[in-house]
Amino acid sequence: MGEVTAEEVEKFLDSNVSFAKQYYNLRYRAKVISDLLGPREAAVDFSNYHALNSVEESEIIFDLLRDFQDNLQAEKCVFNVMKKLCFLLQADRMSLFMYRARNGIAELATRLFNVHKDAVLEECLVAPDSEIVFPLDMGVVGHVALSKKIVNVPNTEEDEHFCDFVDTLTEYQTKNILASPIMNGKDVVAIIMVVNKVDGPHFTENDEEILLKYLNFANLIMKVFHLSYLHNCETRRGQILLWSGSKVFEELTDIERQFHKALYTVRAFLNCDRYSVGLLDMTKQKEFFDVWPVLMGEAPPYAGPRTPDGREINFYKVIDYILHGKEDIKVIPNPPPDHWALVSGLPTYVAQNGLICNIMNAPSEDFFAFQKEPLDESGWMIKNVLSMPIVNKKEEIVGVATFYNRKDGKPFDEMDETLMESLTQFLGWSVLNPDTYELMNKLENRKDIFQDMVKYHVKCDNEEIQTILKTREVYGKEPWECEEEELAEILQGELPDADKYEINKFHFSDLPLTELELVKCGIQMYYELKVVDKFHIPQEALVRFMYSLSKGYRRITYHNWRHGFNVGQTMFSLLVTGKLKRYFTDLEALAMVTAAFCHDIDHRGTNNLYQMKSQNPLAKLHGSSILERHHLEFGKTLLRDESLNIFQNLNRRQHEHAIHMMDIAIIATDLALYFKKRTMFQKIVDQSKTYETQQEWTQYMMLDQTRKEIVMAMMMTACDLSAITKPWEVQSKVALLVAAEFWEQGDLERTVLQQNPIPMMDRNKADELPKLQVGFIDFVCTFVYKEFSRFHEEITPMLDGITNNRKEWKALADEYETKMKGLEEEKQKQQAANQAAAGSQHGGKQPGGGPASKSCCVQ
């Protein structure tokens, strides 16, 4: 095949345009653009000032774009713009002043200084320790920053804003100035200042136009880099808050560990060589033994600095984080005053004033006059510092965080202040966590102490137990030194006979017995249930537990130990005499009788509603069934004591089940729950009548835990109300005790709460007691015993008792009604007689002269 000529190729490409375009894009397009934008020699000669043609100006613009693409450093890009502007404006010098805020005060600092057309970046870039700083109320640049407009000063000697201190400093004479702000929206980012026109007396309007035109490049550069910097700062800020937040919520117990975890985790985002955290002593008031020497004149009073809330400034711990060279963390308890982070006095100053301090040139500040040489062997010296207080939610300064030497050599700026402030503010707020934990810990410790105090006064002591377990008298030793057989022998002689005391009868009365005898009767019930040997209940623990229960009930009118015992005795009678034990295991019977004895322990003589009205702490602790939950917790607290724990030899599963049954039983004594459960109980009673044999029903019930719990709950209600079923001689006395306690609550409501009590609790309506009793029997009590007598006919004596008592109360109520009716009739007769007498005296007319009314009379 012969060689292809150029003409043939051209002809082929002309006739195949799509192929030509595809081939060009694939092979040459990238290279052409790369060559176009790649580095090349400047097409304009900058060695001498001369007028530019349009081609040369285009070349300058293209050079600026290429520089912007190639350079990642803002100062270098702006420097190139300034060099070209020096040539275009034929100016001698140019400078760039960056706008910033330090400690909340705005200022302008040199970043590029003395830029000319032949300048080198390294010579013009100002180091942080060599900055010239202008406040906004000083100099032409300050005026430009405030006005945000371009300023042309033809003659500096005639300008009121001009300040010559830089000329004095540099031995340079500024004759004329052209200055313009670089804006980011409405905010000043920097000021570019052009000085001394070379080819004329001053800068012209044309120069202003050129400056503004080319400042668009500088403006774009500054905007891009400023936004990039802001994005970087916000990213760092987000990372700092995220990571510190995760560590803060990992450590809730101790402020020191919390701060350390958070600050160590975010060290990579803080962008500094070192940082130090000083934790302040939060003591506001000294102990009396520390104050006495001062008051006696033996020690001088504290005259040092104080925090804004009046605390003495005492850094009890300093944590240093060293990030340059080899990373190191140092924790210094009780740091000495000459510690490198405290010797300057800056942390103390920050703690005293609560201000953020940003020191951009540390060696020039009085705080760091001590720094004559490197602080350690690494040769490290403090160059710039950012220090700020750590403030909690109560606005108390809990510590001071100080950051040293920004890694890029520049001083800390406003964004650094914002970022570090976010961190310290978050840490300050997070102090709430360990504070709350400490408070909860103290409350928990106080609770344990109070429980111990209560137990000390409630628990059966070694002298009291000898009234029942007379081991000293019989064996000459303490109960814990005796064998179980020896204790059983003593109890056999001390405990009452169940049949003699009729503790298994529904008509049992506690009135003839002493409280100690009731304790002995309670112990005997456990033996009658045959649970002592089966569950290996320590007999000493059983005696101590029952005696402690009797002491746990308060000495109040009705809800005292006698009531607690009566409820336990009725539960025992329902299980044994009422034959309800067939549905429950021995363990459940043990739990039910124990719950009945515990059900009202530490009762205050007032009901749940009063606890809420009086804002009692119990009402805040328990949302519902307030007193019942308190009785339950009190009983469980006693059982947690090893010397009182009658459940101590149960296995884990048995123990959990026993406690579960106690929970349900005691909470069920809340009458507010009674109306919810009685319909369910009635259905169970109805269902029991559908079974042909008692054995089938018993087997069914034993396997259904829910139904057993409902029956148990209703049994607790029957036990709690059982006083209403006792013989009239007993019931009438007990009813007066109940009424007396209600009246005491009514008195409290009237005097303490300034409220009128309900009729049942109103002492002034004591005569209505029989009527109220009849209503209570009809509305609350009768259903319970009627259904139980249907359920088990052995419980019928309780229904008979309440029926008889209703008749007695009804008779008294009717007698009262008759008496009140007679009094009312007598009153009406007296009123009629008085009316008639008044009418005859005035001739059938009222004293006012009008006719007498036949239907009313004004007394």
UniProtKB/Swiss-Prot annotation:
Cell compartment(s), UniProt: Cell membrane; Cell projection, Cilium, Photoreceptor outer segment
Residue ranges constituting the GAF domain according to the UniProt record: 73-222, 254-431
Family annotation (SMART domains): GAF, HDc
EC number: 3.1.4.35
Residue positions of the active site: 559 (proton donor)
Residues that coordinate or bind a divalent metal cation 1: 563, 599-600, 720
Low complexity: bias regions: 830-840
Keywords associated with the record: Acetylation, Cell membrane, Cell projection, cGMP, Hydrolase, Lipoprotein, Membrane, Metal-binding, Methylation, Prenylation, Repeat, Sensory transduction, Vision
Keyword Acetylation attached: yes
Residues covered by the PDEase domain: 483-816
Membrane protein topology class: Lipid-anchor
Binding site for a divalent metal cation 2: 600
Region (Disordered): 821-859
Positions of modified residues (N-acetylglycine): 2
Cofactor note: Binds 2 divalent metal cations per subunit. Site 1 may preferentially bind zinc ions, while site 2 has a preference for magnesium and/or manganese ions.
Lipidation (S-farnesyl cysteine): 856
Cysteine methyl ester modification, residue list: 856
Biased composition (Gly residues): 841-851
Enzyme class, UniProt record, top EC level: hydrolase
Pfam families in the record: GAF, PDEase_I
InterPro entries attached to this UniProt entry: GAF, GAF-like_dom_sf, HD/PDEase_dom, PDEase, PDEase_catalytic_dom, PDEase_catalytic_dom_sf, PDEase_CS
Assembly description: Oligomer composed of two catalytic chains (alpha and beta), an inhibitory chain (gamma) and the delta chain.
Role summary: Rod-specific cGMP phosphodiesterase that catalyzes the hydrolysis of 3',5'-cyclic GMP. This protein participates in processes of transmission and amplification of the visual signal.
Family stated for the protein in its record: Belongs to the cyclic nucleotide phosphodiesterase family.
Protein name: Rod cGMP-specific 3',5'-cyclic phosphodiesterase subunit alpha
Organism: Bos taurus
Classification of source organism: Eukaryota, Metazoa, Chordata, Craniata, Vertebrata
The encoding gene: PDE6A
